[in-house]
Amino acid sequence: ADLPVIWIEATEEAKALQATLPVFVALKQAGLARSSRIAAIGGGVVQDIATFVASLYMRGIAWSYVPTTFLGMADSCLGGKSSINVGPYKNLIGNFHPPSRIDILPVFARTLPAVELAGGAAEAAKIAFCRGASAFAAYERLAAPVLSGEWKEQQLAELLHATLRVKQWFIETDEFDQAERRLLNFGHTWGHALESATA
């Protein structure tokens, strides 16, 4: 059967609250019901929009996610947070609505420029660092081949698995970002301010 497809341009403008409204209309016009499921394939912008829309469409429907960026694979795919921009304010609103299924395909990382791999590796380093010396030592060992540029998909998969296990600990300890999990937000406020100032 033909499945309806909604294409979303992965830009900060697409994450604006007003820009998400046509997505709700498109889902309705495509005939999605409460029992339907959204399958999101893409990076962080697509994930933010899919999380937000799936959480609100008909008061919430299931969704699954296939991250295509290293940052999405190593971090944001797990946790179920959405972040939506309002006016000049980045990530002002959002909610929690985790995907019911996540499929990580390391082959997508082969399509990414080195700067994208470095960005994902930096976030993975921060996650490991926040957990402690043992987790960070494991990160250093597993990340070395990826950072060298000479890596096999199995090596990337091992790094992703270790990173997501650490993040899972934070989520299970503090699902809604009230205590320990807030450590993972380290650097985000400054980073978002810098992005806004240089946009």
Regions found by a protein language model. Name each.
Residues 138, 142-199:
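Active-site segments that bind and position negatively charged phosphate/pyrophosphate groups
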Residues 1-37:
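ATP/NTP phosphate-donor binding region
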Residues 6-7, 57, 94-96, 171, ...:
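Short hydrophobic "helix-edge" motifs at membrane interfaces and signal-peptide entry regions
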Residues 45-52, 73-74, 192-193:
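Short glycine/serine/threonine-rich phosphate/pyrophosphate-binding segments
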Residues 10-11, 41-43, 186-187:
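Glycine-rich beta-strand-to-loop/alpha-helix junction loops that act as flexible
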